[in-house]
């Protein structure tokens, strides 16, 4: 009996060593994350992340941002993460402003803001945003102290959004901006039953309508990534990575205060949180075209794969938990 217990103890020890080794790999080689506590934003970078630049209103000072826990002040917030986007950002902003101003002209209750989160850009991205902010009092620049990743940029912007609805949208202009209306109509339906709701823009739900143009290799890589996404805990969503998603304000509070993954693979984590939280989630086809310069390196895909495994393991083992959090 003692011999059997000794052998069992050895097997258990080996299993724990293997699990520990796997966990160490996931924690060491994955993307940047916060592991066991609150989001990084208020804890590590309170001053630089909680202030915005708005020269049209306050030309000589940085002004404290509102947070997602304050009462909404506009109808919709467009959150735009930007890293070295000085060339592509102007076209995207022009199209977005034109659309939003048309909506405003038709409906005085349609109020908006654009928050561009400059993720430690090395080019003139911040200057481009400030040029627009000088002309429009509802365009804001939020500066990250250094490059922290797309997920961190979206997180920072959404946690300081003033809108009843919050749209994350890429700076490259790949998605037709007027498709916001499609997501808006859908989220209004979802909000009737649940204030925590998300509408995911999809490039693959309807290939013809989405006008998706991708190479064969990228399609194969996308298929492999989709399998890992399912393993991570995302079900029922065909396109998790489209940078065009609409959130209710209540959904933002829960999602972005519990987000850990800071770079490319944050989207699946948000959807895992939403599923575990039993949020209403819907997927809508949008018009999307692949933009030159928007491709991810192979090393980035490897990190994404590791992060997907990390999401799968850490949530299943309750290392990452979901709960009500505040600043």
Swiss-Prot record:
Entry keyword set: Endoplasmic reticulum, Glycosyltransferase, Membrane, Signal-anchor, Transferase, Transmembrane, Transmembrane helix
Transmembrane parts of this sequence: 7-27
Enzyme class: transferase
Top-level taxon of origin: Eukaryota
Pathway(s) per entry: Protein modification; protein glycosylation
Membrane topology (Cytoplasmic): 28-327
Transmembrane helix listed as a keyword: yes
Localization terms from the record: Endoplasmic reticulum membrane
Catalytic activity: a di-trans,poly-cis-dolichyl phosphate + UDP-alpha-D-glucose = a di-trans,poly-cis-dolichyl beta-D-glucosyl phosphate + UDP
Molecular function terms from GO: dolichyl-phosphate beta-glucosyltransferase activity
GO CC, alphabetical: endoplasmic reticulum membrane
Major location (coarse): endoplasmic reticulum
The EC number(s) this enzyme carries: 2.4.1.117
GO process terms (BP): protein N-linked glycosylation
Keyword Nuclease: no
Lumenal-facing ranges: 1-6
Bilayer disposition of the protein: Single-pass membrane protein
Family: Belongs to the glycosyltransferase 2 family.
Protein function: Dolichyl-phosphate beta-glucosyltransferase involved in the glycosylation of glycoproteins through the synthesis of dolichyl beta-D-glucosyl phosphate which serves as a sugar donor for transfer of three glucose residues to the Man-9-GlcNAc-2-PP-dolichol precursor to N-glycans.
Protein name: Dolichyl-phosphate beta-glucosyltransferase ALG5D
Organism from which the protein derives: Trichomonas vaginalis (strain ATCC PRA-98 / G3)
């Amino acid at each position: 009996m003692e011999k059997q217990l000794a052998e069992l103890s050895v097997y258990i020890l080996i299993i724990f060593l293997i699990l520990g080794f796997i966990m160490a790999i996931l924690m060491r080689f994955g993307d940047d994350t916060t592991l066991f506590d609150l989001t990084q934003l208020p804890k590590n970078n309170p001053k630089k992340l909680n202030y915005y630049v708005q020269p049209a209103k306050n030309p000589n000072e940085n002004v404290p941002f509102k947070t997602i826990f304050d009462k909404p002040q506009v109808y919709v917030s467009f959150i735009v993460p930007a890293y070295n986007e000085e060339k592509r950002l102007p076209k995207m902003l022009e199209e977005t402003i034109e659309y939003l101003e048309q909506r405003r002209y038709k409906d005085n209750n349609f109020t908006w803001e654009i928050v561009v989160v400059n993720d430690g850009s090395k080019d003139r991205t911040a200057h481009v945003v400030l040029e627009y902010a000088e002309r429009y009092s509802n365009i804001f620049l939020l500066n990250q102290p250094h490059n922290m990743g797309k997920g961190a940029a979206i997180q920072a912007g959404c946690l300081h959004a003033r809108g009843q609805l919050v749209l994350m949208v890429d700076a490259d202009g790949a998605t037709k901006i007027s498709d916001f209306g499609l997501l808006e109509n859908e989220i209004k339906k979802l909000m009737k039953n649940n204030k925590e709701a998300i509408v995911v823009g999809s490039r693959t739900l309807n290939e013809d309508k989405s006008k998706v143009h991708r190479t064969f290799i990228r399609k194969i890589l996308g298929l492999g990534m989709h399998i890992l996404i399912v393993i991570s805990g995302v079900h029922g969503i065909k396109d998790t990575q489209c940078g065009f998603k609409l959130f209710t304000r209540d959904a933002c509070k829960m999602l972005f205060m519990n987000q850990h993954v800071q770079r490319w693979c944050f989207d699946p984590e948000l959807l895992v949180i939403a599923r575990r939280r039993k949020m209403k989630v819907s997927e809508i086809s949008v018009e999307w075209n692949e933009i030159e310069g928007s491709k991810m390196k192979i090393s980035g895909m490897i990190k994404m794969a590791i992060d997907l495994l990390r999401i799968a393991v850490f949530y299943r083992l309750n290392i990452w938990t979901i709960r009500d959090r505040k600043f």
